[in-house]
Amino acid sequence: MSLPPLTLYLAAPRGFCAGVDRAIKIVEMALEKWGAPVYVRHEIVHNKYVVDGLRAKGAVFVKELDDCPDDRPVIFSAHGVPKAVPAEATRREMVYVDATCPLVSKVHIEAERHHAGGLQMVMIGHAGHPETVGTMGQLPDGEVILVETVADVATITPRDPDKLAFITQTTLSVDDTADIVAALQARFPAIVGPHKEDICYATTNRQGAVKAMAPKADAMLVIGAPNSSNSKRLVEVGRSAGCAYAQLVQRAEDIDWRALEGISSIGITAGASAPEVLVNEVIEAFRTRFDLTVEQVETAQENVEFKVPRVLREPAGA
């Protein structure tokens, strides 16, 4: 029996970004240097496959520093941590490595700079997301006002409307954030913004590729974790760019094949913490059911790389 034809559009860029790549390397190098167990505060990146792989090598994932012994190394996740966390690790004389993405650290520095200049911060982000918690935790309580939607902008009550600056989570929807920024600027004309957009290159590029791919595809799958902010945004971007059926799947076994009956094209992308091995697994699952033609939809090229901290580049005992 011949298989039905299907065009599979593959978004590029997709998958791992430089910050995720660096964070995973940090855990692997820490295990090489210090042996197991190495403790990691929160999931190093939001992807079950990656976390399970590191756990098998000897990484122990915990919620808080209280769950770590004093005498084993601890790594802080790529999302960033409140200032109180490294301060506590230092007090306990722990060996720690900060795997915060450098582009998240840039937002932290920005927040501190504006705070030092007497400005109150408005953060555009998702409540409870580790990155938002970490960024807001760079400043004293009450110094950062969280805004999640355009509607929130109308309800906030800053100390002084003329002394405000805004920052954003790095993994937001580019379009939604632009709407919130416009609302902030309309209500608070004096508000100061970042020199360069806080939403990172990888988030922007992956959303750009989805926008180019979505109108061509009958359906779209985003490979990513349900707790991955940037992956969930890719689903939303796909839907708003004209693809009626856009779904998040962790891996091939999650695909709802009945929902895909009768399609002649599908778009595939992956969130910034999803490894390429899971993309290949999904493509192979389609290959067993369809006569597949794969077309890459490339909208940008990436060559960003971040160095790991010096402590991991030095031999043990150095």
UniProtKB/Swiss-Prot annotation:
Active-site residues, record numbering mapped to chain: E131
Binding-site positions, isopentenyl diphosphate: H46, H79, H129, S228, S229, N230, S273
Residues the entry annotates as binding [4Fe-4S] cluster: C17, C101, C200
Catalyzed reaction equations: isopentenyl diphosphate + 2 oxidized [2Fe-2S]-[ferredoxin] + H2O = (2E)-4-hydroxy-3-methylbut-2-enyl diphosphate + 2 reduced [2Fe-2S]-[ferredoxin] + 2 H(+); dimethylallyl diphosphate + 2 oxidized [2Fe-2S]-[ferredoxin] + H2O = (2E)-4-hydroxy-3-methylbut-2-enyl diphosphate + 2 reduced [2Fe-2S]-[ferredoxin] + 2 H(+)
Cofactor-binding details, from the entry: Binds 1 [4Fe-4S] cluster per subunit.
Keywords per UniProt: 4Fe-4S, Iron, Iron-sulfur, Isoprene biosynthesis, Metal-binding, Oxidoreductase
Record's keyword annotation contains Iron: yes
Broad EC category: oxidoreductase
Cofactor: [4Fe-4S] cluster
NCBIfam families: ispH_lytB, PRK01045.1-2, PRK01045.1-4
UniProt-recorded name of the protein: 4-hydroxy-3-methylbut-2-enyl diphosphate reductase
Gene: ispH
